[in-house]
Amino acid sequence: MRQLDRRSALAQGLSEDELMIKAGGAAFRALSEKWPEAATLAVLCGRGNNGGDGWVVARLALEAGLACDVYVTGDPSDITGSAQCAHARWAAVSGSAPRPISALFSTDVALDQYDLIVDALVGIGMTHRPRPEFEDWIAALADAQSPIMSLDIPSGLSADGGPSSGAAIRADLTMTFIAPKPVLLTGPRLDHVGDLIIDPLDTPASTYREITPVALALRNEQSGWLPVRSRIAHKGSFGHVLVIGGDTGMGGAALLAAAGALRGGAGLVSLATRQCHVMAALSRYPEVMVRGIEDPSALKNLLIGKDVIVIGPGLGQDVWGQTCLEIALKTSVPVVCDADAINLIASGVVSVSGAGPRVLTPHPGEAARLAGCTVADIEADRLGSAKRLALKTESTIALKGAGTVVAAPTPDALPIICCHGNPGMATGGMGDVLAGLIGALLAQRLEPIAATAIAVGAHAEAADMAWQEQGVGLTPSDVVERLGGVLTQV
């Protein structure tokens, strides 16, 4: 991260000090826009560059006529580098010394006297578990009624999204600079981020190509990933997806997967499910060719001529589901494994290895079973977990959750983090739709990593559109109905 900061400054002909002034200025403009009525600020500054951004914000606040108190960790004389320059400029305007941060949490100071608290304590500089006094400060801030804005990342978090424990600032707004940090996009600490603003600080595009990132960010402004459809195309041009699932009582999951494949643009969609679900499936989606199978051996004929298999939604883990999965995984076409298919693979009764490409879409619990670890282990390092699972299973992985991570089964491939999605997606059936959508894009001849990444992004963006209308009442069917429009823009 620091290397990227230096290269950004160099590319723009700026000193590190000038880049810090630019970052602090952007932060002050952002807080002024979000909290225009804020007249009294408390800025918490560490002794590093994150604190330097804070000194810039504090100086600009004073120059704008706001009341602003600065609280600093340690002795201000220990501040060095560009942060020292920023501190000196603040001191020249303030005419006073900063207060020790311990004073902020004394009985003589009321936190709620401030309209806004700015966190410039550590940022990306946190490389170890916070000291006990830091944890005490965070606990006190948690009781404050004033909103908190964090600069770069909420202090206490690990920037790369790796293992992070202990206390961390819970911000209402985080403003990060030059490039997003993984911890701001994925993982169990997203509630600490609040609203997120990413300001590139005018960093040239060429600068990003000089640095090897830890991950790629998947965002809705990216386009041109899907091939343009020929005017003389026919249904065979876009592949035939076979969805297998829906054991007794679980037909809805398989039907949602089939719906995802339909709206994902597959030329043909077939569904193999229990006989008891056939009538309901045909009534809901007459476009789907539905076949009731009680004997899994009937799948062998159904597999002929299919371009992609999606298996797992509502599959169950008894003999019927296990046998269906064994047959499906013997084929050489791409197979998308979701839900119970993943659980069966994790249990060891079925091997995922096969002649064709495989895509697995585990949620954290399923990922933990695949990896033989705890859910906490998976969530503590989502990037690393997805990469390790991809290599272990020789499959493309979509590790679902807040900030879904997509990883390819090659050691040098960068994981991809989805920047979209919302809490309304935390409902049964969302993953089934995603599995069908991935299958549809595979059927259109996309490579597994591209098909999975595009599907994850489109699925999340469609859900964001539905969230604006439905809120907590969001359903997987709402997402299905918006997929076609989203994919048209990809």
Regions found by a protein language model. Name each.
Residues 58-143, 279-292, 298-305:
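N-terminal small/polar loop signature for handling phosphorylated ligands or for N-terminal nucleophile
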Residues 115-116, 121-212:
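Internal gly/pro-rich beta-alpha loop/helix module
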Residues 82, 133, 167-170, 429, ...:
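Short acidic-hydrophobic sequence patches enriched in Asp/Glu that either
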Residues 1-73, 80, 184-339, 343-359, ...:
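Small-residue (G/A/S/T)-rich helix-start motifs and N-terminal tracts that mark the onset
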